[in-house]
Amino acid sequence: MTKTKIIGILNVTPDSFSDGGKYNSVDKAIARAKEMIDEGVDIIDVGGVSTRPGHTEVSLEEEMERVVPVVEQLVKLDVQISVDTYRSEVAEACLKLGATMINDQWAGLYDPKIFDVVSDYNAEIVLMHNGDGQREQPVVEEMLLSLLTQANKAEMAGIEKGNIWLDPGIGFAKSRSEEKEVMARLDELVATEYPVLLATSRKRFIKEMIGKETTPAERDEATAATTVYGIMKGIQAVRVHNVDLNVKLAQSIDFLKENEHERHHLS
């Protein structure tokens, strides 16, 4: 059965929009990681730089100090480790320790050396669509062009196609109407035949789906609805805060999709 991967978010930051400060010591971060493993997480994504609107710029040294000690301990656990960074130096330090995936919110545009680093360690990379929000093309066309250009650079650096993930970047450099367009046309990203990761968890897009004022933690059920929708569209992974809920939903949808596939196959 095709299994949708659940990537659990572990922010080791003081200022992330959903859980800033909650896991910003090594002990707290490891305790949360163990909880996620018990809940059935496939990959834990460690981030030391907040992406919330208005976040403070973090120096390379500070990002290293936040992330590396956590990764050093996480690699002792039985789980795949991803690091959410756009800096090749952080990527290299963490891959050297045993991380096997880099989640780059700038898709190699900020630091092109990241492709060579990921290739050297035969690791996976997530390329997220981002930008300044200014575009001359419609959003989906611009997203596809941008991501495929960066994916090609990743392949040229020696990263295997199956190790290159595409993320449509919900919550980044898009208007609300553009985000709705991207969600409706996720299957066009899936059609590129690169594995696709969807990361909507607790974001403003989810808040607007609900249609009323909510805290980030109150957006988990609506986030899970996008998990189901994404799986039906063909995505292969979701990046979420609430691992338990999304594991259960993804397993159930995977089962139902497989059942439908088998019935078609038999007939």
Swiss-Prot record:
Q: Which CDD domains match?
A: DHPS
Signal peptide range: none
Q: What does this chain do?
A: Catalyzes the condensation of para-aminobenzoate (pABA) with 6-hydroxymethyl-7,8-dihydropterin diphosphate (DHPt-PP) to form 7,8-dihydropteroate (H2Pte), the immediate precursor of folate derivatives.
Q: Does the keyword Repeat apply?
A: no
The cofactors required by this protein are: Mg(2+)
Gene Ontology cellular-component annotations:
cytosol
Outline the extent of the Pterin-binding domain: 1-251
Pathway(s) served: Cofactor biosynthesis; tetrahydrofolate biosynthesis; 7,8-dihydrofolate from 2-amino-4-hydroxy-6-hydroxymethyl-7,8-dihydropteridine diphosphate and 4-aminobenzoate: step 1/2
Name the keywords, alphabetized: Folate biosynthesis, Magnesium, Metal-binding, Transferase
Q: Which GO terms describe its molecular function?
A: dihydropteroate synthase activity; metal ion binding
Name of the protein: Dihydropteroate synthase
The source's domain of life comes to: Bacteria
Task: Please tell me which top-level EC class this enzyme sits in.
Answer: transferase
Its GO biological process annotations read: folic acid biosynthetic process; tetrahydrofolate biosynthetic process
Residues bound to (7,8-dihydropterin-6-yl)methyl diphosphate: 51, 84, 103, 167, 203, 239-241
Q: Indicate the family of this protein.
A: Belongs to the DHPS family.
Q: Provide the species name.
A: Staphylococcus haemolyticus
Q: Which reaction does it catalyse?
A: (7,8-dihydropterin-6-yl)methyl diphosphate + 4-aminobenzoate = 7,8-dihydropteroate + diphosphate
Which amino acids does the record list as binding Mg(2+)?
A: 11
Q: What is its EC number?
A: 2.5.1.15
